[in-house]
Amino acid sequence: MKTYKPYRHQLRRSLFASTIFPVFMVMIIGLISFYAIYIWVEHRTIHQHTYQTQTELQRIDKHFHTFVTQQQKQWRHVDLSHPADITKMKRQLLKQVHQQPAILYYDLKGSSQSFTNNYEQLDTTKMYLISKYRIDFKDDTYILKIYMSSTPLLKNIKKNSGQSALIVDSYDTVLYTNDDRFSIGQKYQPPQFGFMNESLKLNSHHAHLIIYKDIHETIEDGIALLVVMGVVLILLVIFGYISADRMAKRQSEDIEAIVRKIDDAKNRHLGSYEPLKKHSELEEINNYIYDLFESNEQLIQSIEQTERRLRDIQLKEIERQFQPHFLFNTMQTIQYLIPLSPKVAQTVIQQLSQMLRYSLRTASHTVKLAEELSYIEQYVAIQNIRFDDMIQLYIDATEGVQHQTIGKMMLQPLVENAIKHGRDSEPLKITIRIRLTKRKLHILVHDNGIGMSPSHLEHVRQSLHHDVFDTTHLGLNHLHNRAMIQYGTYARLHIFSRSQQGTLMCYQIPLV
């Protein structure tokens, strides 16, 4: 017997792919999501740090502006040539400097002397000049400059977030930086890629604070993450391959057993029921193989029942074609017409004979649509003799449509239903409209009769699916069942009606 290793290999590949591919996609999506969230968080923190730093620097600037404004009048009486006034002035400036949340240096310079707290003689050109004031003292006019070396806030931002700060003037000249990549006095030109920053205005001189970060600094963390993910992926590949191979082997063993049982079933050598070694969904197939023999008997019974049903429908077809009530009523009409109008009676007899010849013709079950419409016209003509020309028939069908074939006697039940259930004391107008599409023939029969109530309409629709012997709507029921037998589920019969507004029957059959 053939081995089924190709299937086993295919199953193993499928299992392996279904295991590894989702994990791989999750890892890729996770990596992309990580960097997307990282960028979003960095933008948020840069915005927050920029706003905090701007607020702090503006508060320092405002504080010294208020201080100098308040002391301006008093300083006009201060003589900085006297040691006592010098000491007092230094104490005032040191007090204001030490109150601020930043490392500040003041530089008070006159024409002959200067004072500062920059005892270490740091390079003030590398500091940010927060404010500059011209102050008139008693002995001379001095220039007061307040420099910022750094702030705890900027140090924490650089230490914890890796974000650096720049202060530039209106010409993008660097005034302050805590990053070695930029120098005081050079033009600020941010990199085009991998560089996040945000800028806010600091003062009326159009100086701007810029907080920025180079996201390339996170490459090392990203590489470490990729290495970890790569190791995990390799382990998953190894584990997934081994697991897929074992699972494919188990499943293929059950399938091979099922194939053997199918082969035995073909040769009618299948014994008693034997379950598979491993319980799985394949057990349903195994059960089906054994149930197949029992279902064969049920299938034979179903075929016999269907054949009986077809014979019943054929009997009803013969019964309907003879139309005993229609024949009886027509014969009474002829009997009534013979003494009064022999010519009319002769015409009715000729029409009736043609109708009987048409309905009893058994050479074919299909006819041209033109023949069926001619039969309908004769049928309505006889009914008009009975009902004093109270029925008006209109046929809307092109010549090309009339050459299409249709099942014999498949339109008459629709017209008969319109006359039987739609006629009242007013003239009855029946319109037959036939349209041809690419694959279907659409037949619409509309009357302006009394129509049906919603409950009656629902009852008629339900009766289409009843047994041919269990419904009073024999004509429509028979038509529906015959169409289902002849055309299958492609045939459709829809009924629409409103009380006192007429009835519309839509009949759809596929082209033969």
UniProtKB/Swiss-Prot annotation:
Tell me the residues on which Phosphohistidine occurs.
325
Enzyme Commission identifier(s): 2.7.13.3
Molecular functions per Gene Ontology: ATP binding; phosphorelay sensor kinase activity
In its keyword annotation, does this UniProt entry include Transmembrane helix?
yes
- Histidine kinase domain: residues covered: 297-512
Q: Which SUPFAM superfamilies match?
A: ATPase domain of HSP90 chaperone/DNA topoisomerase II/histidine kinase
Keyword tags: ATP-binding, Cell membrane, Kinase, Membrane, Nucleotide-binding, Phosphoprotein, Transferase, Transmembrane, Transmembrane helix, Two-component regulatory system
Q: Where are the transmembrane segments?
A: 20-40, 222-242
Q: Which InterPro entries match?
A: Bact_2-comp_sensor_kinase (IPR050640), HATPase_C_sf (IPR036890), Sig_transdc_His_kin_internal (IPR010559)
**Broad enzyme group:** transferase
Listed under catalytic activity are:
ATP + protein L-histidine = ADP + protein N-phospho-L-histidine
Does Chloroplast count among this protein's keywords? no
**Record's bilayer topology term:** Multi-pass membrane protein
Name any GO cellular component annotation: plasma membrane
* Compartment(s): Cell membrane
Tell me how the protein is altered or processed after translation: Autophosphorylated.
Q: What does this protein do?
A: Probable member of the two-component regulatory system SE_0166/SE_0165. May activate SE_0165 by phosphorylation.
Q: Per its record, how is this protein called by name? A: Uncharacterized sensor-like histidine kinase SE_0166
Q: Which organism is it from?
A: Staphylococcus epidermidis (strain ATCC 12228 / FDA PCI 1200)
